């Protein structure tokens, strides 16, 4: 993991298209701004993990349903 220090209003560039800027610092809370193309999905980590879990659950249900449907056709 690359660890970088930034001050207020300083930024980090990721590739050609993504900029991460420090917007404010208030105690232990840091607000960042992310400028990225619209096709790049950006989520807080806990939201991303919840999305992944829900997608896995939905895929599992779909596979179970597909298996039941194919066994009924026989």
From Swiss-Prot:
A translational regulator that binds mRNA to regulate translation initiation and/or mRNA stability. Usually binds in the 5'-UTR at or near the Shine-Dalgarno sequence preventing ribosome-binding, thus repressing translation. Its main target seems to be the major flagellin gene, while its function is anatagonized by FliW. Its main location: cytoplasm. One of its GO terms (molecular function) is mRNA 5'-UTR binding. It comes from Bacillus licheniformis (strain ATCC 14580 / DSM 13 / JCM 2505 / CCUG 7422 / NBRC 12200 / NCIMB 9375 / NCTC 10341 / NRRL NRS-1264 / Gibson 46). This is Translational regulator CsrA. One of its GO terms (biological process) is negative regulation of translational initiation. It is found in: Cytoplasm. Keywords: Bacterial flagellum biogenesis, Cytoplasm, Repressor, RNA-binding, Translation regulation.
């Amino acid at each position: 993991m690359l660890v970088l220090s930034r001050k207020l209003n300083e930024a980090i560039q990721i590739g050609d298209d993504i900029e991460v800027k420090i917007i404010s610092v208030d105690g232990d809370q840091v607000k960042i701004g992310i400028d990225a193309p619209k096709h790049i999905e950006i989520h807080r980590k806990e939201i991303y993990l919840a999305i992944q879990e829900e997608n896995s659950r939905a895929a599992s249900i779909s596979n179970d349903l597909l298996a039941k449907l194919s066994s009924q056709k026989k």
